[in-house]
Protein backbone atom coordinates (compact mmCIF):
# COMPACT_ATOMS: atom_id res chain seq x y z
CA UNK A 1 0.00 0.00 0.00
CA UNK A 2 1.27 3.49 -0.82
CA UNK A 3 -0.50 6.78 -0.20
CA UNK A 4 0.68 9.44 -2.64
CA UNK A 5 0.64 13.12 -1.75
CA UNK A 6 1.20 16.15 -3.96
CA UNK A 7 4.58 17.92 -3.68
CA UNK A 8 4.30 21.14 -1.73
CA UNK A 9 5.39 24.50 -3.00
CA UNK A 10 8.06 24.87 -0.31
CA UNK A 11 11.48 26.17 -1.33
CA UNK A 12 13.35 23.53 0.66
CA UNK A 13 14.69 20.34 -0.87
CA UNK A 14 13.03 17.89 1.52
CA UNK A 15 11.13 15.23 -0.35
CA UNK A 16 7.54 14.41 0.49
CA UNK A 17 7.36 11.45 2.84
CA UNK A 18 5.33 8.55 1.44
CA UNK A 19 3.48 6.03 3.61
CA UNK A 20 4.55 2.45 2.99
CA UNK A 21 2.51 -0.50 4.16
CA UNK A 22 2.78 -4.12 3.11
CA UNK A 23 -0.17 -6.47 3.38
CA UNK A 24 -0.81 -7.88 6.84
CA UNK A 25 0.92 -11.24 7.46
CA UNK A 26 -1.23 -14.23 6.61
CA UNK A 27 0.29 -16.46 9.29
CA UNK A 28 -0.62 -16.13 12.94
CA UNK A 29 1.84 -15.38 15.71
CA UNK A 30 3.67 -18.19 17.43
CA UNK A 31 2.97 -18.16 21.15
CA UNK A 32 0.46 -18.53 23.94
CA UNK A 33 -2.92 -16.87 23.41
CA UNK A 34 -5.56 -16.40 26.10
CA UNK A 35 -9.05 -17.51 25.05
CA UNK A 36 -10.80 -16.28 28.20
CA UNK A 37 -11.58 -17.16 31.80
CA UNK A 38 -11.71 -20.78 32.94
CA UNK A 39 -15.04 -20.23 34.66
CA UNK A 40 -16.70 -19.30 31.38
CA UNK A 41 -15.82 -22.68 29.83
CA UNK A 42 -16.53 -24.95 32.81
CA UNK A 43 -20.30 -25.29 32.51
CA UNK A 44 -20.31 -28.71 30.85
CA UNK A 45 -21.20 -27.31 27.43
CA UNK A 46 -19.13 -26.93 24.25
CA UNK A 47 -18.00 -23.39 23.43
CA UNK A 48 -17.23 -21.93 20.03
CA UNK A 49 -14.17 -19.71 19.47
CA UNK A 50 -13.33 -18.14 16.11
CA UNK A 51 -9.55 -17.87 16.07
CA UNK A 52 -6.50 -18.41 13.85
CA UNK A 53 -8.57 -18.34 10.68
CA UNK A 54 -10.83 -21.20 11.75
CA UNK A 55 -13.27 -22.23 14.47
CA UNK A 56 -12.31 -24.01 17.69
CA UNK A 57 -14.37 -25.89 20.24
CA UNK A 58 -13.61 -25.74 23.96
CA UNK A 59 -15.08 -28.40 26.25
CA UNK A 60 -14.41 -29.93 29.65
CA UNK A 61 -14.01 -33.68 30.12
CA UNK A 62 -15.40 -35.66 33.06
CA UNK A 63 -12.49 -34.57 35.26
CA UNK A 64 -13.00 -30.90 34.47
CA UNK A 65 -9.94 -30.65 32.21
CA UNK A 66 -10.52 -28.18 29.38
CA UNK A 67 -9.75 -29.33 25.86
CA UNK A 68 -9.51 -27.38 22.61
CA UNK A 69 -10.03 -28.99 19.20
CA UNK A 70 -10.63 -27.79 15.67
CA UNK A 71 -14.40 -27.36 15.63
CA UNK A 72 -15.10 -28.83 12.20
CA UNK A 73 -15.57 -32.60 12.37
CA UNK A 74 -13.19 -34.53 10.11
CA UNK A 75 -16.04 -36.86 9.12
CA UNK A 76 -18.38 -34.57 7.16
CA UNK A 77 -17.55 -31.12 8.49
CA UNK A 78 -20.14 -30.80 11.24
CA UNK A 79 -19.62 -28.10 13.85
CA UNK A 80 -18.52 -29.77 17.08
CA UNK A 81 -19.18 -26.59 19.05
CA UNK A 82 -22.90 -27.18 18.37
CA UNK A 83 -22.68 -30.74 19.59
CA UNK A 84 -22.82 -32.29 23.06
CA UNK A 85 -20.25 -33.32 25.64
CA UNK A 86 -20.59 -37.06 26.26
CA UNK A 87 -18.25 -38.42 28.91
CA UNK A 88 -14.73 -37.36 27.98
CA UNK A 89 -15.58 -36.62 24.35
CA UNK A 90 -17.36 -34.02 22.27
CA UNK A 91 -20.06 -35.54 20.03
CA UNK A 92 -20.71 -34.10 16.59
CA UNK A 93 -24.35 -33.03 16.07
CA UNK A 94 -24.24 -34.32 12.48
CA UNK A 95 -23.52 -38.07 12.93
CA UNK A 96 -22.53 -38.41 16.61
CA UNK A 97 -18.85 -39.07 15.94
CA UNK A 98 -17.08 -38.57 19.27
CA UNK A 99 -13.69 -36.96 19.78
CA UNK A 100 -11.61 -36.88 22.94
CA UNK A 101 -9.35 -34.11 24.17
CA UNK A 102 -6.35 -35.51 22.31
CA UNK A 103 -8.19 -35.29 19.00
CA UNK A 104 -8.79 -39.02 18.60
CA UNK A 105 -12.17 -40.36 17.53
CA UNK A 106 -13.29 -42.63 20.35
CA UNK A 107 -16.64 -43.89 19.11
CA UNK A 108 -18.99 -43.98 16.13
CA UNK A 109 -22.19 -45.47 17.58
CA UNK A 110 -23.55 -46.76 14.26
CA UNK A 111 -20.24 -48.13 12.94
CA UNK A 112 -18.49 -51.47 13.60
CA UNK A 113 -15.15 -49.77 14.12
CA UNK A 114 -13.44 -46.40 14.22
CA UNK A 115 -11.10 -45.74 11.26
CA UNK A 116 -7.54 -45.80 12.65
CA UNK A 117 -6.75 -42.52 10.88
CA UNK A 118 -9.67 -40.70 12.55
CA UNK A 119 -7.85 -37.88 14.28
CA UNK A 120 -8.38 -34.13 14.39
CA UNK A 121 -6.21 -31.27 15.61
CA UNK A 122 -5.95 -30.90 19.37
CA UNK A 123 -4.47 -27.65 20.64
CA UNK A 124 -1.94 -27.53 23.46
CA UNK A 125 -3.55 -25.80 26.43
CA UNK A 126 -2.49 -24.16 29.67
CA UNK A 127 -4.73 -23.36 32.64
CA UNK A 128 -3.25 -20.65 34.84
CA UNK A 129 -4.32 -17.48 36.65
CA UNK A 130 -7.95 -18.49 36.20
CA UNK A 131 -7.53 -18.30 32.42
CA UNK A 132 -7.31 -20.68 29.46
CA UNK A 133 -4.45 -20.38 26.97
CA UNK A 134 -3.72 -22.20 23.71
CA UNK A 135 -0.38 -22.54 22.00
CA UNK A 136 -0.17 -21.62 18.31
CA UNK A 137 2.83 -22.49 16.17
CA UNK A 138 2.60 -22.59 12.36
CA UNK A 139 5.54 -25.05 12.38
CA UNK A 140 3.75 -27.38 14.77
CA UNK A 141 6.42 -27.25 17.47
CA UNK A 142 5.50 -27.62 21.16
CA UNK A 143 5.96 -24.63 23.48
CA UNK A 144 9.50 -24.25 24.87
CA UNK A 145 9.69 -24.51 28.65
CA UNK A 146 11.18 -21.02 28.97
CA UNK A 147 8.39 -19.41 26.93
CA UNK A 148 5.38 -19.51 29.21
CA UNK A 149 2.83 -17.42 31.03
CA UNK A 150 3.95 -16.60 34.60
CA UNK A 151 1.77 -17.29 37.59
CA UNK A 152 0.37 -14.08 39.05
CA UNK A 153 1.38 -13.90 42.69
CA UNK A 154 -1.63 -13.49 44.95
CA UNK A 155 -4.26 -14.49 42.42
CA UNK A 156 -6.76 -16.93 43.89
CA UNK A 157 -6.09 -15.86 47.49
CA UNK A 158 -8.40 -13.94 49.80
CA UNK A 159 -6.15 -10.89 49.46
CA UNK A 160 -7.29 -10.19 45.90
CA UNK A 161 -10.61 -9.92 44.09
CA UNK A 162 -11.58 -12.23 41.26
CA UNK A 163 -11.32 -11.11 37.65
CA UNK A 164 -13.56 -8.41 36.27
CA UNK A 165 -13.36 -9.34 32.59
CA UNK A 166 -14.46 -7.79 29.30
CA UNK A 167 -13.85 -8.25 25.58
CA UNK A 168 -14.12 -6.39 22.28
CA UNK A 169 -14.06 -7.76 18.74
CA UNK A 170 -11.95 -5.49 16.53
CA UNK A 171 -12.61 -5.62 12.78
CA UNK A 172 -10.38 -4.17 10.09
CA UNK A 173 -7.16 -4.03 12.13
CA UNK A 174 -4.17 -6.28 12.67
CA UNK A 175 -3.02 -7.18 16.17
CA UNK A 176 0.15 -5.10 15.70
CA UNK A 177 -1.84 -1.92 16.22
CA UNK A 178 -2.36 -2.64 19.91
CA UNK A 179 1.21 -3.88 20.44
CA UNK A 180 2.55 -0.54 19.15
CA UNK A 181 1.08 1.06 22.28
CA UNK A 182 3.97 -0.42 24.29
CA UNK A 183 6.28 2.36 23.06
CA UNK A 184 3.77 5.13 22.35
CA UNK A 185 4.05 7.55 25.26
CA UNK A 186 2.37 10.54 23.60
CA UNK A 187 -0.88 8.76 22.77
CA UNK A 188 -1.60 8.36 26.50
CA UNK A 189 -1.85 12.15 26.76
CA UNK A 190 -3.86 12.81 23.60
CA UNK A 191 -6.08 9.71 23.45
CA UNK A 192 -6.41 8.53 27.06
CA UNK A 193 -5.99 11.91 28.80
CA UNK A 194 -3.23 10.60 31.03
CA UNK A 195 -0.16 12.72 31.81
CA UNK A 196 3.01 10.59 31.46
CA UNK A 197 5.94 11.79 33.59
CA UNK A 198 8.33 8.86 33.17
CA UNK A 199 8.50 6.35 30.31
CA UNK A 200 10.93 3.52 29.60
CA UNK A 201 10.98 0.33 27.52
CA UNK A 202 12.96 -2.88 27.91
CA UNK A 203 12.82 -5.69 25.32
CA UNK A 204 14.52 -9.04 25.87
CA UNK A 205 13.84 -12.53 24.58
CA UNK A 206 10.09 -13.07 24.26
CA UNK A 207 9.19 -10.18 26.63
CA UNK A 208 8.61 -6.47 26.03
CA UNK A 209 8.08 -4.15 29.00
CA UNK A 210 6.78 -0.62 29.40
CA UNK A 211 7.47 1.34 32.59
CA UNK A 212 5.34 4.45 33.02
CA UNK A 213 4.62 6.90 35.83
CA UNK A 214 1.68 9.18 35.14
CA UNK A 215 -0.90 11.46 36.68
CA UNK A 216 -4.32 12.61 35.54
CA UNK A 217 -4.98 15.72 33.48
CA UNK A 218 -6.60 18.55 35.41
CA UNK A 219 -8.31 19.85 32.28
CA UNK A 220 -10.13 16.63 31.33
CA UNK A 221 -12.60 14.35 33.09
CA UNK A 222 -12.58 11.30 30.85
CA UNK A 223 -14.16 8.55 32.92
CA UNK A 224 -10.97 6.47 32.66
CA UNK A 225 -8.56 5.45 35.40
CA UNK A 226 -6.43 8.56 34.88
CA UNK A 227 -8.84 11.24 36.10
CA UNK A 228 -7.36 12.16 39.51
CA UNK A 229 -4.55 14.71 38.88
CA UNK A 230 -3.30 14.24 42.44
CA UNK A 231 -2.86 10.46 42.16
CA UNK A 232 0.31 9.03 40.67
CA UNK A 233 -0.12 5.80 38.73
CA UNK A 234 2.96 3.58 38.46
CA UNK A 235 2.75 0.92 35.78
CA UNK A 236 4.99 -2.01 34.82
CA UNK A 237 3.41 -3.69 31.81
CA UNK A 238 5.03 -6.73 30.18
CA UNK A 239 4.08 -8.69 27.09
CA UNK A 240 4.92 -12.36 27.56
CA UNK A 241 5.00 -13.33 23.91
CA UNK A 242 3.00 -11.67 21.13
CA UNK A 243 -0.42 -11.37 22.71
CA UNK A 244 -0.54 -11.52 26.51
CA UNK A 245 0.33 -8.58 28.75
CA UNK A 246 0.36 -8.39 32.53
CA UNK A 247 0.31 -4.84 33.90
CA UNK A 248 1.20 -4.38 37.56
CA UNK A 249 -0.15 -1.02 38.76
CA UNK A 250 0.16 1.01 41.94
CA UNK A 251 -1.83 4.18 42.56
CA UNK A 252 -1.37 6.55 45.49
CA UNK A 253 -4.42 8.52 46.57
CA UNK A 254 -5.68 9.84 49.91
CA UNK A 255 -2.75 8.34 51.78
CA UNK A 256 -3.38 4.82 50.47
CA UNK A 257 -1.69 2.68 47.83
CA UNK A 258 -4.05 0.70 45.62
CA UNK A 259 -2.55 -2.31 43.86
CA UNK A 260 -4.18 -3.50 40.65
CA UNK A 261 -3.24 -6.14 38.11
CA UNK A 262 -4.53 -5.59 34.60
CA UNK A 263 -4.53 -8.18 31.84
CA UNK A 264 -4.45 -6.96 28.24
CA UNK A 265 -4.57 -9.84 25.78
CA UNK A 266 -5.85 -10.73 22.34
CA UNK A 267 -6.15 -13.56 19.85
CA UNK A 268 -6.47 -13.25 16.06
CA UNK A 269 -9.69 -14.11 14.27
CA UNK A 270 -8.17 -13.46 10.85
CA UNK A 271 -5.25 -11.38 9.62
CA UNK A 272 -7.35 -8.20 9.90
CA UNK A 273 -9.59 -8.98 12.86
CA UNK A 274 -8.92 -9.88 16.47
CA UNK A 275 -10.62 -10.27 19.83
CA UNK A 276 -9.27 -7.96 22.53
CA UNK A 277 -9.78 -9.11 26.12
CA UNK A 278 -8.89 -7.34 29.34
CA UNK A 279 -9.54 -7.79 33.01
CA UNK A 280 -8.52 -6.50 36.40
CA UNK A 281 -8.09 -7.72 39.96
CA UNK A 282 -7.56 -5.42 42.93
CA UNK A 283 -5.74 -6.11 46.18
CA UNK A 284 -8.20 -5.65 49.01
CA UNK A 285 -7.49 -2.75 51.37
CA UNK A 286 -7.77 -3.25 55.14
CA UNK A 287 -11.33 -2.68 56.29
CA UNK A 288 -12.76 -2.79 52.76
CA UNK A 289 -15.50 -5.37 52.14
CA UNK A 290 -15.29 -7.94 49.37
CA UNK A 291 -18.21 -6.23 47.62
CA UNK A 292 -16.51 -2.83 47.58
CA UNK A 293 -13.22 -4.37 46.42
CA UNK A 294 -15.01 -6.20 43.60
CA UNK A 295 -16.67 -2.92 42.67
CA UNK A 296 -13.25 -1.27 42.49
CA UNK A 297 -12.06 -3.97 40.09
CA UNK A 298 -15.19 -3.56 37.96
CA UNK A 299 -14.75 0.22 37.91
CA UNK A 300 -11.14 -0.17 36.84
CA UNK A 301 -12.12 -2.60 34.06
CA UNK A 302 -14.78 -0.17 32.85
CA UNK A 303 -12.17 2.58 32.73
CA UNK A 304 -9.90 0.31 30.71
CA UNK A 305 -12.81 -0.43 28.37
CA UNK A 306 -13.30 3.26 27.70
CA UNK A 307 -9.57 3.60 27.06
CA UNK A 308 -9.57 0.76 24.54
CA UNK A 309 -12.67 2.17 22.85
CA UNK A 310 -10.68 5.37 22.36
CA UNK A 311 -7.91 3.30 20.75
CA UNK A 312 -10.36 1.44 18.53
CA UNK A 313 -11.75 4.69 17.16
CA UNK A 314 -8.22 5.59 16.05
CA UNK A 315 -7.50 2.15 14.57
CA UNK A 316 -10.74 2.17 12.57
CA UNK A 317 -9.74 5.36 10.79
CA UNK A 318 -5.94 5.24 10.54
CA UNK A 319 -3.78 3.89 7.74
CA UNK A 320 -1.41 0.99 8.39
CA UNK A 321 2.16 2.25 8.20
CA UNK A 322 5.44 0.35 8.04
CA UNK A 323 7.70 3.40 7.89
CA UNK A 324 6.44 5.76 10.62
CA UNK A 325 8.11 9.16 10.71
CA UNK A 326 9.32 9.64 14.28
CA UNK A 327 10.56 12.36 16.60
CA UNK A 328 13.00 11.78 19.47
CA UNK A 329 10.11 11.55 21.93
CA UNK A 330 8.16 8.92 19.99
CA UNK A 331 9.86 5.90 21.49
CA UNK A 332 11.55 2.85 19.90
CA UNK A 333 8.83 1.88 17.44
CA UNK A 334 11.16 0.15 14.98
CA UNK A 335 12.93 -1.79 17.73
CA UNK A 336 9.58 -2.96 19.10
CA UNK A 337 8.46 -4.12 15.68
CA UNK A 338 11.70 -6.07 15.22
CA UNK A 339 11.01 -7.75 18.58
CA UNK A 340 7.43 -8.50 17.49
CA UNK A 341 8.58 -9.96 14.15
CA UNK A 342 10.18 -12.96 15.91
CA UNK A 343 6.69 -14.40 16.41
CA UNK A 344 5.90 -14.31 12.67
CA UNK A 345 8.97 -16.10 11.30
CA UNK A 346 10.12 -19.70 11.60
CA UNK A 347 12.17 -20.38 14.72
CA UNK A 348 15.34 -20.93 12.68
CA UNK A 349 14.89 -17.49 11.08
CA UNK A 350 14.84 -15.54 14.36
CA UNK A 351 17.78 -13.12 14.37
CA UNK A 352 19.72 -11.73 17.32
CA UNK A 353 18.38 -8.20 16.87
CA UNK A 354 14.85 -9.53 17.48
CA UNK A 355 15.63 -10.93 20.93
CA UNK A 356 18.70 -9.20 22.37
CA UNK A 357 18.19 -6.90 25.35
CA UNK A 358 17.27 -3.34 24.42
CA UNK A 359 16.56 -0.47 26.81
CA UNK A 360 15.31 3.02 26.03
CA UNK A 361 14.10 5.78 28.32
CA UNK A 362 12.35 8.77 26.79
CA UNK A 363 13.51 12.17 27.97
CA UNK A 364 10.14 13.58 29.01
CA UNK A 365 11.40 17.12 29.75
CA UNK A 366 10.11 18.72 26.56
CA UNK A 367 6.84 16.77 26.54
CA UNK A 368 6.01 17.53 30.17
CA UNK A 369 6.68 21.25 29.72
CA UNK A 370 4.54 21.39 26.58
CA UNK A 371 1.70 19.43 28.15
CA UNK A 372 1.74 21.51 31.33
CA UNK A 373 1.34 24.62 29.19
CA UNK A 374 -1.51 23.05 27.21
CA UNK A 375 -3.33 21.97 30.37
CA UNK A 376 -2.94 25.45 31.90
CA UNK A 377 -4.29 27.10 28.75
CA UNK A 378 -7.26 24.72 28.69
CA UNK A 379 -8.03 25.40 32.36
CA UNK A 380 -7.91 29.15 31.69
CA UNK A 381 -10.35 28.79 28.79
CA UNK A 382 -12.65 26.68 30.94
CA UNK A 383 -12.56 29.31 33.68
CA UNK A 384 -13.39 32.07 31.19
CA UNK A 385 -16.30 30.02 29.88
CA UNK A 386 -17.71 29.38 33.35
CA UNK A 387 -17.61 33.07 34.28
CA UNK A 388 -18.92 34.42 30.98
CA UNK A 389 -22.25 36.24 31.10
CA UNK A 390 -25.00 34.41 29.17
UniProtKB/Swiss-Prot annotation:
Residues 32-134 form the Rieske domain. PROSITE patterns: RIESKE. One of its GO terms (molecular function) is 2 iron, 2 sulfur cluster binding. Gene3D superfamilies: Naphthalene 1,2-dioxygenase Alpha Subunit, Chain A, domain 1 (3.90.380.10), Rieske [2Fe-2S] iron-sulphur domain (2.102.10.10). [2Fe-2S] cluster binds at residues 73, 75, 92, 95. It catalyses: androsta-1,4-diene-3,17-dione + 2 reduced [2Fe-2S]-[ferredoxin] + O2 + 2 H(+) = 9alpha-hydroxyandrosta-1,4-diene-3,17-dione + 2 oxidized [2Fe-2S]-[ferredoxin] + H2O. It is an enzyme of class 1 (oxidoreductase). GO terms for biological process: cholesterol catabolic process. CDD domains: Rieske_RO_Alpha_KSH. Fe cation binds at residues 181, 187, 192, 311. Probably involved in the degradation of cholesterol. Homotrimer. The two-component system 3-ketosteroid-9-alpha-monooxygenase is composed of an oxygenase component KshA and a reductase component KshB. This is 3-ketosteroid-9-alpha-monooxygenase, oxygenase component. It comes from Rhodococcus rhodochrous. The lineage of its organism: Bacteria, Bacillati, Actinomycetota, Actinomycetes, Mycobacteriales.
Amino acid sequence: MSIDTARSGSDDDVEIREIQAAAAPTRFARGWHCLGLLRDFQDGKPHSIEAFGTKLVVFADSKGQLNVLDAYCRHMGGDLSRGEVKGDSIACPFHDWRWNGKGKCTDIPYARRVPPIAKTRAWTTLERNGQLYVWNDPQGNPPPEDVTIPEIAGYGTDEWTDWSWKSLRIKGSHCREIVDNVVDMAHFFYIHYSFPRYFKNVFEGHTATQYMHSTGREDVISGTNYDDPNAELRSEATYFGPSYMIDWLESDANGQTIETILINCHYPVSNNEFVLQYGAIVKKLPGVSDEIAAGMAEQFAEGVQLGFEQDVEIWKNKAPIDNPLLSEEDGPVYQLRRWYQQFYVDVEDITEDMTKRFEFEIDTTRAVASWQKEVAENLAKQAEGSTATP
